[in-house]
Amino acid sequence: QDGKLADYTLLLFEETVKAIFNKAVREELIAFNPVHSLTKVERFHAPDKHREYLTPEELTRFLNVECATENERTVQMAFGLSSMTGIRLGDMQHLRWGDIKLIDGVQTICIIQRKTKRPATIPLNDMALSFLPPREDDNPESLVFHLVKKSDNISKYVRRIKDKAGIEKDFTYHSSRHTTATLAISAGADISSVKEVL
């Protein structure tokens, strides 16, 4: 709220920048990754509170779980979209079809974030679009995801799915936001847009 980014957000940005340079090295665009030349003091550090995030492989396992109920499936798909976009659970619970607009030929989520009151404009790549459920009607006020109301119940479904996936990390729905930056390069997400919601 003071205009500064959280320590963990800065760490995720550093990891994302490092991934960009690693990709540039692999494609022989640059000779070495300049992030590796930073001293320990110059690098960002994780905050004391440990926050879990999923690797791409773990997220794939989570999303490939065969869900037993419609509520479980809805949480699974919403988690996938949050992992691609960084959208908070509170915003996902209130996301309406009218919030998804076609801008320059690209399906884009345009919302005012409930927590920060700041606007966020997030273009959706093909992977993100795959998490959207079939639209039931033409009403722009209709919810995209019919998620259960209580966050505790959503956490219950997340734990159930992750146990089925054989993932030992103790993570919650909020962990999807910590996964976003680590997926940004591999998923083709627009980093400047992701920054808006992180």
Model-found features: residue ranges?
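Hydrophobic recognition helices of helix-based DNA-binding modules
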Residues: 17-25, 132-135, 184, 188
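Active-site/catalytic core of tyrosine-dependent DNA strand-transfer enzymes
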Residues: 59, 125-168
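C-terminal catalytic core of tyrosine-transesterase DNA break-rejoin enzymes
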Residues: 80, 84-91, 157-160, 164, ...
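Short, polar N-cap/turn motifs at the start of nucleic acid-interacting alpha helices
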Residues: 99-106, 168, 189-198
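Basic, Lys/Arg- and aromatic-enriched nucleic-acid-binding interface segment
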Residues: 3-7, 11-16, 26, 30-89, ...
